[in-house]
Amino acid sequence: MADPAATPKSLSIACVSIKDTFAEAFDMKATRLIVTADDRRWCDESARAMCGFGTSVIACGLEIAVEQTLSPEQTPDGRPGVAILAFGMSGKDLEKQIPRRAGQCVLTCPTTALYGGIPGGREVHPKRVPIGKSLRYFGDGNQISKQIQHLDADGRSRPVRYWRIPVMDGEFVCQHDVGRVDAIGGGNFILVGRTMQSVTIASRAAIDAMRELPGIITPFPGGTTRSGSKVGSKYAALFASTNDSFCPTLREVTPSELPSEANAAIEVVIDGLSFDEIAESMRVGITAACEAGASEGLLSVSAGNYGGKLGRHHFKLHELLADASSASDSGAER
């Protein structure tokens, strides 16, 4: 008689199969920035430029995207703002890349200002990421600084230095430096469907639902990527190449993770400030994808991993989604 414990458990949400696998994620460093401006359009234009070409550390230096839109009541200077999360493989990557993007995309944009925005209660690394410390020299000796006392999350007062750099619309105000924290990159899930339309509908529903969550970004175009990768390549110069097990055109020539009726797959990749924030975003995103995609031909949800060899953070789909599956099943029974 078969051991029930050895039999893989089936799990589904809205009749979409959830594979018994895990997403493998790895350690990163992150910072959170707040861009403000006189109006929403300038703010969004600056953020769009700063986050451009920021999908993957493989070629972009950083993984960076807008985390949240902020009302004037949520920003340091009472103006419209956005919060941006940036992730690098090391603190040095942040120290190199952030001043470049700030100088080219925020300093240049009319009326903007730039501040640090790491949420309270996080353990901040003592070595900080330069902003005004680097950009002040653009003022050619006319820049001035001022220290203002701020209260930390624990109630302690500490001085924060700001720079005022003269520019053609007045002054560019920015913080001297900003904090960085330990973070996680590479949380993910893969949506498998009968058609491209089915995974498009599902992925957009997932991203729309996840957009409201703090502490995470989905840095690829529209929050998704079709070019999921595996570690290694037949070409020595590449350390990553196409994830052939999810490519429908390679089903006959390589071991495939796709069922015979599947013709498309899309991956959602998530970077976050903590394990719990990524886990919650995966729960929310996958649930929304299944509910929106089930009637459109979404077949299953899987995840990308490397056998545990790349990252120490493992997001097991069945553990994350057990409650969502139970709620879905009870809803279907009613």
UniProtKB/Swiss-Prot annotation:
Q: Which organism is it from?
A: Rhodopirellula baltica (strain DSM 10527 / NCIMB 13988 / SH1)
Q: Which reaction does it catalyse?
A: N-formylmethanofuran + 5,6,7,8-tetrahydromethanopterin + H(+) = N(5)-formyl-5,6,7,8-tetrahydromethanopterin + methanofuran
Instruction: Tell me its EC number(s), please.
Output: 2.3.1.101
Q: Which family does it belong to?
A: Belongs to the FTR family.
Q: State a GO cellular component annotated for this protein.
A: cytoplasm
Q: What are the protein's GO molecular function terms?
A: formylmethanofuran-tetrahydromethanopterin N-formyltransferase activity
- Biological function: Catalyzes the transfer of a formyl group from 5-formyl tetrahydromethanopterin (5-formyl-H(4)MPT) to methanofuran (MFR) to produce formylmethanofuran (formyl-MFR) and tetrahydromethanopterin (H(4)MPT).
- Subcellular localization, per the record? Cytoplasm
Looking at the record's lineage, which domain of life comes first? Bacteria
Recite the lineage of the species.
Bacteria, Pseudomonadati, Planctomycetota, Planctomycetia, Pirellulales
Q: Which Pfam families match?
A: FTR, FTR_C
Group of enzyme by EC: transferase
This protein's pathway reads: One-carbon metabolism; formaldehyde degradation; formate from formaldehyde (H(4)MPT route): step 4/5
Instruction: Provide the protein name.
Output: Formylmethanofuran--tetrahydromethanopterin formyltransferase
GO BP terms: namely: formaldehyde catabolic process; one-carbon metabolic process
Gene3D superfamilies according to UniProt: 3.30.70.520
Major location (coarse) = cytoplasm
Cysteine-cysteine disulfides: none
Q: Which UniProt keywords apply?
A: Acyltransferase, Cytoplasm, One-carbon metabolism, Transferase
Subunit text = Homotetramer.
InterPro entries associated with the record: ForMFR_H4MPT_ForTrfase, ForMFR_H4MPT_ForTrfase_C, ForMFR_H4MPT_ForTrfase_fd-like, ForMFR_H4MPT_ForTrfase_N
UniProt xrefs under SUPFAM superfamilies: Formylmethanofuran:tetrahydromethanopterin formyltransferase (SSF55112)
